[in-house]
């Protein structure tokens, strides 16, 4: 005897890039523009910063040092 269970509709799996963009939009909506900053991105926002003491690192961070009032994470080799 066959099961007459309804078949769920097929949905297109979300692309990782789409998921990331959606999450980033939600974070910016909740916490404000500039809440997520990528290393090396130039920002048009005026953000007060504390120098790291390294001109190269300050330039790489993008705002001239560690941004004040924000949680930062730097990782890598």
UniProtKB/Swiss-Prot annotation:
A Pfam family assignment: RecA
Cellular component GO terms held in the UniProt record: cytosol
Assigned keywords, A-Z: ATP-binding, Cytoplasm, DNA damage, DNA recombination, DNA repair, DNA-binding, Nucleotide-binding, SOS response
GO biological process, one term: SOS response
Top-level taxonomic group: Bacteria
Subcellular locations according to the entry: Cytoplasm
Keyword Lipid biosynthesis: no
Magnesium in keyword set: no
InterPro entries with a match to the protein in the record: DNA_recomb/repair_RecA, P-loop_NTPase, RecA-like_N, RecA_ATP-bd
Molecular function (Gene Ontology), one example: single-stranded DNA binding
Reported function: Can catalyze the hydrolysis of ATP in the presence of single-stranded DNA, the ATP-dependent uptake of single-stranded DNA by duplex DNA, and the ATP-dependent hybridization of homologous single-stranded DNAs. It interacts with LexA causing its activation and leading to its autocatalytic cleavage.
Annotated family: Belongs to the RecA family.
Protein name as annotated: Protein RecA
Name of encoding gene: recA
